[in-house]
Amino acid sequence: MEAPAPSLTEEDLTEVKKDALENLRVYLCEKIIAERHFDHLRAKKILSREDTEEISCRTSSRKRAGKLLDYLQENPRGLDTLVESIRREKTQSFLIQKITDEVLKLRNIKLEHLKGLKCSSCEPFAAGATNNLSRCNSDESNLSEKQRASTVMYHPEGESSTAPFFSMASSLNLPVLEVGRTENSSFSSATLPRPGDPGAPPLPPDLRLEEGGSCGNSSEMFLPLRSRALSRQ
């Protein structure tokens, strides 16, 4: 949707008319006869009696026209009233076209200036929004690249990450360890009878024979060694 075209305020139009009088000053001073417009300008309250007397004090027609333009520039309705007076005189109608063309030219310049200011005020915002969007996209891509790199570095393919591992250990392994620790403590606290103690079950015959044989063999092994040592002495 197109933005509405800028329009001139009353202050802008007053400035345009003032600039038009200034640009046409030399031309109008040569063409205008100030005394012909006194009556109409005084009737419209643009000039006072003292103003007309001040203008009449000038020695030449060009100076009187210049002083008249000074008063017209000070009044927002000065140029419009001068055009009305020229139209009433019907002797210098070509001045109306000259003044109108100058006003329209300055008006268009003013509009173009306002349009340029409006566009320049919008451009930084749009550029900033685009930069912010691109910056956000680049940040997101950089973050995803970093996450992907960390995943490849610390968690090779086929290996789960550490966070799920510890969460699984805390939820599954810890209860098992606690149960095992409880059972071990119960078994260690209970005292079992040794072989030969009252209440201990009898040994199997094979184990009794092996135990007896080992004792006999041990005595036989040491006695010859002791006798050999004595014989050498």
Swiss-Prot record:
Pfam families: CARD (PF00619). Residues 195-205 have a biased composition (Pro residues). GO terms for molecular function: CARD domain binding; cysteine-type endopeptidase activator activity involved in apoptotic process; general transcription initiation factor binding; identical protein binding; kinase activator activity; NF-kappaB binding; protease binding; protein heterodimerization activity. Keywords: Acetylation, Adaptive immunity, Apoptosis, Cytoplasm, Immunity, Innate immunity, Isopeptide bond, Membrane, Phosphoprotein, Tumor suppressor, Ubl conjugation. Residues 185-233 are annotated as: Disordered. Highly expressed in heart, brain, spleen, lung, liver, skeletal muscle, kidney and testis. Detected in developing brain, olfactory epithelium, tongue, whisker follicles, salivary gland, heart, lung, liver and intestinal epithelia of stage 15 embryos. GO terms for biological process: adaptive immune response; antifungal innate immune response; apoptotic signaling pathway; B cell apoptotic process; cellular defense response; cellular response to lipopolysaccharide; cellular response to mechanical stimulus; immunoglobulin mediated immune response. Phosphorylated by IKBKB/IKKB. Ubiquitinated via both 'Lys-63'-linked and linear ('Met-1'-linked) polyubiquitin chains in response to T-cell receptor (TCR) activation. Ubiquitination is recognized by IKBKG/NEMO, the regulatory subunit of I-kappa-B kinase (IKK), and is required for TCR-induced NF-kappa-B activation. Linear ubiquitination at Lys-17, Lys-31 and Lys-63 is mediated by RNF31/HOIP; linear ubiquitination is recognized with much higher affinity than 'Lys-63'-linked ubiquitin by IKBKG/NEMO. CARD11 is required for linear ubiquitination by HOIP by promoting the targeting of BCL10 to RNF31/HOIP. The record marks R228, A229 as: Cleavage. The modification Phosphoserine is found at S138. Residues 13-101 form the CARD domain. Changing E54A: Decreased interaction with CARD11. It is found in: Cytoplasm; Membrane raft. Its main location: cytoplasm. There is a cross-link at K17, K31, K63 (Glycyl lysine isopeptide (Lys-Gly) (interchain with G-Cter in ubiquitin)). GO terms for cellular component: CBM complex; cytoplasm; cytoplasmic microtubule; cytosol; immunological synapse; lysosome; membrane raft; nucleoplasm. The modification N-acetylmethionine is found at M1. PANTHER family: B-CELL LYMPHOMA/LEUKEMIA 10, B-CELL LYMPHOMA_LEUKEMIA 10. Plays a key role in both adaptive and innate immune signaling by bridging CARD domain-containing proteins to immune activation. Acts by channeling adaptive and innate immune signaling downstream of CARD domain-containing proteins CARD9, CARD11 and CARD14 to activate NF-kappa-B and MAP kinase p38 (MAPK11, MAPK12, MAPK13 and/or MAPK14) pathways which stimulate expression of genes encoding pro-inflammatory cytokines and chemokines. Homomultimer; homooligomerized following recruitment by CARD domain-containing proteins that form a nucleating helical template that recruits BCL10 via CARD-CARD interaction. Self-associates by CARD-CARD interaction and interacts with other CARD-proteins such as CARD9, CARD10, CARD11 and CARD14. Forms a complex with CARD14 and MALT1; resulting in the formation of a CBM (CARD14-BCL10-MALT1) complex. Forms a complex with CARD11 and MALT1; resulting in the formation of a CBM (CARD11-BCL10-MALT1) complex. This is B-cell lymphoma/leukemia 10. It comes from Mus musculus.
